[in-house]
C-alpha cells in the first residue's frame, strides 16, 4: 500500500487444532510461518514481530499436541519474533479438564495463559477463557485492568486484543460461536482491534472485519471451514472441502494506522484485498460497519453464462457458470424449481459459491433429489455478502 510504512507486523491465527492424526495442520502452520518470513524479506520493513494463535491450538489438549506447537515455535520462529497463545474449549478437552490444561500449558510453554505484551510500542493483550469459552468475574477484572493500562499509555494508538470466541454482534461466525460476557468492557475502548476465532469462518469473507464500538477481526482456521448461515442444503460445514489454512497478516505504521490482509497458505497467496483501519480510536471514522448492507453493487450473470441440467432417474443436477460481482465475491446461490403445469414451487435450495477457496471454480452445481415425474423450470439467482441479490438469473427447463 502506498504511503504506508510498517513499524509492526504480526500473524493473527486461530484454531490450529494440532493433532498427530492430521499432521497437515501443523505442517501448514509451519509453512505459513516460512512464507511470511519470505514476504517480510521482500519488503522495506523486514521483521515478523509476532505470531499469535488465538485458542484451540491443541485439538484435544493432549501433551503431544501442545508440544508440537511449541516445537513449531522453537524450530520455525526467529529470535526476534514473539509468540502469543490463548487457550479455550479444545485445550480443556484433555483428561482432567481445564485444571489439567492450565498445568500443561505452564509446563510446556513456560508463560501465563493471560498476557499483556508490549511489542514495538504497541500493546498486545491476550486472555484465555474459562469453563469452555466463558469469562468469569476474575477474567473480566483482569481484562479491564490491562486495558486501562494500555489506554493510559496512549489513547490514540491501537490496542491489539485477543480471545478465542467471537464477540456477539461483530464478525461473521458470531451467531453460533460468539459470547457477550465482555462486550460491556470492550466497548469502552474503541482503540481495541479485537481478534477472535472459534467459528472457522473464512478470513476472506468481508464480514470477517466489523466495526461498531471497536474493530473486530476473525482469524480463520487450519482445520475445516464452517459458515454462519443455516439455510444451506448441507448445514453449516461445506462438504468435500480440503482442510483450511488461513490467517490474517497485520501491519501498523507510526501513525497508528492498521493494515489487515487475509492470507491463504494452501495457495501461498494473499486474497487480493486489504482492510485499512485509519484511526482505530475514533468510531466516527469506521468504514467496516453494518452500513455495508446498503450497497448498490450486485452480482450478475454474464451474457455468455451457461446452465445445464442433467437428469438421472428422479434426480436432477444443475451446473452453471458462476455469477460475477464488481466487489468482494458471490456468497451463495438459490435454486428454485417450479412445476411447469401450474408454476408451483416444488423445491428451493441454497448453497455456497465456494468463495472461501482462494481459486474459486468457474462453475457451481447442486443436486435436486427425488422429484416426481413431470416437467419443470429451474431458476438460479446469486447473492452477495450483503443480501444483495443478483440483477438477473439463469433459467433452464427439464423433465424427469
Model-assigned labels for residue ranges:
Residues 21-27, 150-199, 203-209:
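Active-site-proximal segments of metal-dependent phosphoesterases and phosphodiesterases across multiple
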Residues 316-329:
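Conserved aromatic anchor
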Residues 62-154, 178-188, 204-241, 245-252:
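Extended active-site neighborhood of metal-dependent phosphoesterases/phosphodiesterases
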Residues 207-303:
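Binuclear metal-dependent phosphoesterase catalytic core
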Residues 1-64:
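N-terminal active-site segment of His-dependent metallophosphoesterases
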Residues 368-388:
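Beta-strand-rich modules
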Residues 12-14, 49-56, 82-89, 160-164, ...:
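Active-site neighborhood of phospho(di)ester-bond hydrolases with catalytic His/Asp-centered motifs
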Amino acid at each position: 500500500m502506498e504511503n504506508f510504512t510498517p513499524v509492526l507486523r504480526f500473524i493473527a491465527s486461530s484454531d490450529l487444532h494440532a493433532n498427530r492424526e492430521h499432521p497437515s495442520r501443523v505442517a501448514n502452520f509451519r509453512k505459513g510461518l516460512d512464507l511470511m518470513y519470505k514476504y517480510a524479506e521482500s519488503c522495506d520493513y523486514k521483521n515478523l514481530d509476532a505470531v499469535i494463535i488465538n485458542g484451540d491450538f491443541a485439538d484435544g489438549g493432549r501433551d503431544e499436541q501442545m508440544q508440537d506447537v511449541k516445537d513449531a515455535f522453537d524450530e520455525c520462529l526467529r529470535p526476534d519474533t514473539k509468540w502469543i497463545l490463548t487457550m479455550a474449549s479444545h485445550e480443556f478437552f484433555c483428561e482432567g479438564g481445564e485444571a489439567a490444561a492450565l498445568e500443561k500449558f505452564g509446563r510446556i510453554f513456560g508463560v501465563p495463559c493471560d498476557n499483556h505484551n508490549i511489542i514495538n510500542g504497541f500493546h498486545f493483550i491476550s486472555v484465555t477463557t474459562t469453563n469452555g469459552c466463558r469469562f468469569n468475574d476474575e477474567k473480566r477484572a483482569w481484562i479491564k485492568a490491562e486495558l486501562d493500562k494500555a489506554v493510559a499509555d496512549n489513547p490514540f494508538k491501537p490496542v491489539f486484543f485477543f480471545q478465542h470466541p467471537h464477540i456477539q454482534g461483530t464478525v461473521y461466525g458470531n451467531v453460533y460461536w460468539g459470547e457477550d460476557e465482555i462486550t460491556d468492557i470492550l466497548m469502552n475502548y474503541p482503540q481495541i482491534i479485537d481478534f477472535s476465532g472459534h467459528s472457522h469462518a473464512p478470513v476472506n469473507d468481508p464480514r470477517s472485519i466489523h466495526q461498531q464500538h471497536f474493530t473486530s477481526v476473525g482469524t480463520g482456521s487450519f482445520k475445516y471451514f464452517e459458515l454462519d448461515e443455516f439455510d444451506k442444503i448441507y448445514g453449516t460445514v461445506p462438504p468435500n472441502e480440503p482442510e483450511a489454512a488461513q490467517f490474517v497478516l497485520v501491519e501498523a505504521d507510526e501513525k497508528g494506522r492498521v493494515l489487515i490482509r487475509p492470507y491463504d497458505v494452501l495457495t501461498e497467496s494473499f486474497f487480493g484485498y486489504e482492510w485499512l483501519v485509519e484511526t482505530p480510536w475514533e468510531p466516527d471514522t469506521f468504514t467496516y460497519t453494518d452500513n455495508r448492507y446498503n450497497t448498490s453493487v450486485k452480482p450478475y450473470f454474464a451474457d455468455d453464462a451457461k446452465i445445464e441440467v442433467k437428469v438421472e432417474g428422479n434426480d436432477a443436477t444443475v451446473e452453471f457458470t458462476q455469477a460475477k460481482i464488481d466487489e468482494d465475491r458471490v456468497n451463495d446461490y438459490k435454486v428454485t424449481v417450479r412445476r411447469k403445469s401450474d408454476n408451483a414451487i416444488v423445491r428451493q435450495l441454497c448453497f455456497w459459491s465456494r468463495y472461501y477457496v482462494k481459486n474459486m471454480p468457474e462453475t457451481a452445481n447442486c443436486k435436486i433429489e427425488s422429484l416426481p415425474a413431470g416437467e419443470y423450470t429451474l431458476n438460479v439467482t446469486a447473492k452477495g455478502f450483503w443480501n444483495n441479490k443478483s440483477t438477473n438469473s439463469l433459467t433452464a427447463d427439464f423433465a424427469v
